[in-house]
C-alpha cells in the first residue's frame, strides 16, 4: 500500500525527496515520507517565515492534493495539518521552534511513569518487564548514547514465563535508574553544526593516538549524511559478499578484523585521508595485554571527553575515522553487547547527552589510517601522500557530489535497492528552489 501511495503522488510530481528507513537523508530543505496512508513532510524554512508564507512544502502539498483528487480522494480535514511549528508524526515529536526531535511526548511520559513504578515496587512479571524495556529502547531512538546504559536488562526476564512475577537484580534496576535520569536529554538538535575538524584514531599494542585535519564544511556535511547507521550493513573488505552488520558483537573483533579492508581496492575514506595532511592531537600508552577492541575504543572516548569540555552554545556533529570495525558498529548503534566495549561506551554516554555532542565513527582501512603512525612511534603525516589527488578525492574535496562519489559511498554499505527499482519515475518539474530563498 505504501508503494501504491507513493506512485500516486509521484505521478503528480510530489514525493520527490523521500525519507527512507536506514538510508541517508535527502539533501534538500524538504523531506517527504509515506507510511501506508499517511503522507508527511518536514521543510526547513527561514526563522522569519510564517505558516502562510510559500515554501517548497506548499508546492508539494498542492501537487499531493491534485494527486488525490485525480482518483477521487479527499484528505480528512481533522487529520490534515499544514504549516505547523510543532508536530507529532513518524513516531516522533518534532519541535520546530527549538529545532529538536525526540520520541513521542506522551509515550515518553508513560515510559518514565512505568519505570518509576517499577523501581519502587522492585518486582514485575516478565511480560511487563519486557514491555518497559521495549519502551525504553523506543525513547532512546533519538539519543543512541542512552542505549549504553542498558545491558543486562535485555535478558533479565529470559528465565521466567510471561505472567510470572520475579524480582529484578539490583544491577538491572540500577541500569534503568541511570537511564531514567537522562531521559530529559534524549533528543536531537536539528540545528547542530558540523565540526570541520575531522579526527582519526588508532591503537597499536602499546599506545593509542588521535590526529586531526580540517575539511570543507560541505564535505563534512555530506560525510555526516553518509555516516554508518544502526542496522545498516557495512562493507569493510570491499567485496559484495563480505558484509559486517553493525549489530555484530565486538568480541569477534581482532587485529585481523581491523586490517581486512586493506585487502580491497582503495575506498573513498582511504583516498580522502591520503589527499590531506594531518596534525597530532594526543597520544598515550595502553596496556599491552588489553584487547585490541578496547584499545581502539579508548582514543575515541578520550576524544569525546575533550570535545565535551569545549564551551559552545549549541550541539555539535563530529566525525572520527577508525580502522576498527567493531567500534564502527558499536558507536553507530550507541551500545555494544560485548563485555569489553559496553563499559567504555557507558562512561562517555553522559558526556554526549549533556553537551549535545553527536559523534559518528567512519571506517578507514588501516593502511590509510593517519593515526597509525604515532601509535607505532613514527611521525604524524602532515602532508598528503600523493602530489596529485585521485579523481574521487578531488571530487570530494571540491564538493562535486555526483555519480562517482555516490557509487563510492554505496559500495561501502549494504543499502536498499534504489528508488528507480521500486517506484515509478516522478512526473513534472522539480519543486521551485527559490520560493523561500535561502533556508
Q: Residue locations for each model-derived region?
A:
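Nucleic-acid-interacting cores, centered on viral/eukaryotic replication and modification enzymes
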Residues: 1-439
